[in-house]
Regions:
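A short glycine-rich, Lys/Arg-flanked "PGG" loop and its adjoining helix->strand segment in the class I
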Residues: 47-62
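C-terminal helical/coil "lid" or tail adjacent to the Rossmann-like core of SAM-dependent
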Residues: 119-177, 192
Length: 195
C-alpha cells in the first residue's frame, strides 16, 4: 500500500521497509525528522519506540508524533449505545497492554527520552454525515469483537445491539460525531550529548 501511494504520486527516492519500531536496524543519527502517527497507541512499551526514534534522529534533528486520546470521543445528542462502545474500546486496548489515552503522555515520553524544545498541540474533528471516520469507533469495536468476547467485556447479543443502535444514531444527519483528541508533539534531539 505504501509503495503504491509513493508510486502513484511520482515520489522518487522512497524506500519502503518493514521493521520492528523498537529496533529498526537503521543507522543512528541518519534522519533530520523521525515521525510516527498512531503507532504508540498500539504498543505495550511506547518508551522503547520513542527511544528508537530519538536514536534515529541526527543531532539537532526533530522527532514528532501524532497520537490519539480516545477519552474525548462523543456524539451529540448523547446515545447510550455509543457511550457504551466508547467504554468497551479503551478497555479492550488497555487489557492488551496498550494505552488508549497515550496522546496526552507523548510530550512526557519525549522529555524522558532526552528531547528538548518539546511542544504539544491537540486537534479534534467533527465527522459529517457520509464521512467514513464517523463510525470509526463502532468499526474498531466490531474488528475487536473476538477479543472483546474472550475478555468478557460484552456478550454477542449486546455487541450486536450496540452496533445497530449506534450506527442508526450516527446515520441521523442531526447527530454531531466528535473524534477523540489527536495530540501532536515534537521535540529536538540535542546537538551534543548533555553532561
Amino acid at each position: 500500500m505504501a509503495a503504491e501511494f509513493a508510486a502513484g504520486r511520482g515520489l522518487g527516492g522512497v524506500e519502503i521497509m518493514t521493521a520492528d519500531a523498537r529496533r529498526t536496524g537503521l543507522p543512528s543519527g541518519s534522519f533530520d525528522l523521525v515521525h510516527a502517527r498512531t503507532l504508540l497507541v498500539n504498543v505495550p512499551e511506547p518508551a522503547q519506540v520513542v527511544a528508537e526514534m530519538v536514536r534515529l534522529a541526527r543531532p539537532g534533528g526533530w522527532v514528532a508524533g501524532m497520537e490519539p486520546d480516545t477519552e474525548y470521543a462523543s456524539c451529540y445528542p448523547p446515545h447510550p449505545a455509543f457511550t457504551r462502545i466508547c467504554e468497551i474500546f479503551p478497555a479492550t486496548f488497555s487489557r492488551n497492554g496498550a494505552d488508549p489515552m497515550i496522546g496526552r503522555r507523548v510530550p512526557e515520553l519525549f522529555r524522558r527520552a532526552g528531547l528538548v524544545d518539546v511542544g504539544v498541540d491537540a486537534r479534534v474533528q467533527i465527522y459529517p454525515p457520509g464521512n467514513s471516520r464517523r463510525t470509526i469507533r463502532i468499526d474498531l469495536v466490531r474488528s475487536m469483537r473476538p477479543q472483546i468476547l474472550e475478555m468478557g467485556l460484552a456478550g454477542e447479543t449486546e455487541l450486536d445491539e450496540l452496533d445497530a443502535a449506534a450506527r442508526a444514531h450516527l446515520d441521523d444527519p442531526r447527530t454531531v460525531a466528535v473524534s477523540g483528541l489527536l495530540f501532536m508533539a515534537w521535540g529536538r534531539k540535542t546537538a551534543r550529548p548533555s553532561t
